[in-house]
């Protein structure tokens, strides 16, 4: 039995606009919103993210945070600031030795970065959980 219906939501700069979107989601039977948070959102819009979570909760929606496009390791077309600042921490092809345009989860640098990203959002925004995209 399906107990939750979810929609992904991207664009964390205007909570008033999101409120209207969240109300429309509810009117269509959605019970959970997945907030796609990019590295840019984390660096630039982070102060807004708790307000989005609070607004969704106020309207009766559960909230999952999705670290979308983070390090290009997780899906998404977004630019990775981590990769721009840490080119030595990219994945390397086992077949060709070529450096790939994705963060390498085997490096402590990326693990620390990703852990900080997730724990900071969990602590500050208080979502109901995380969604790995």
What are the residue ranges of the model-derived segments?
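Charge-patterned, long linear interaction tracts outside catalytic cores
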Residues: 127-133
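Active-site-adjacent "subsite" loops/lids of carbohydrate-active enzymes
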Residues: 53, 65-125
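The substrate-binding groove and active-site-proximal loops of carbohydrate-active enzymes
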Residues: 3-13, 33-44, 96-116
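Short beta-strand/loop segments at the ligand-binding rim of alpha/beta enzyme cores
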Residues: 1-4, 60-64
């Amino acid at each position: 039995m399906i107990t939750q219906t979810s929609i992904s939501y991207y664009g964390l700069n205007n909570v008033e606009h999101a409120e209207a979107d969240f109300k429309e989601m509810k009117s269509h039977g959605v019970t959970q919103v997945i907030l796609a948070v990019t590295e840019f959102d984390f660096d630039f819009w982070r102060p807004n993210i708790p307000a989005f979570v609070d607004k969704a909760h106020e309207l009766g929606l559960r909230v999952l945070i999705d670290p979308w496009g983070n390090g290009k390791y997780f899906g998404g077309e977004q630019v990775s600031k981590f990769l721009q600042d840490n080119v030595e921490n990219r994945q390397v092809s086992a077949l060709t030795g070529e450096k790939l345009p994705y963060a390498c989860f085997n490096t402590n640098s990326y693990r620390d970065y990703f852990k900080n990203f997730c724990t900071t959002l969990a602590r500050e925004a208080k979502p109901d959980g995380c969604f790995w995209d």
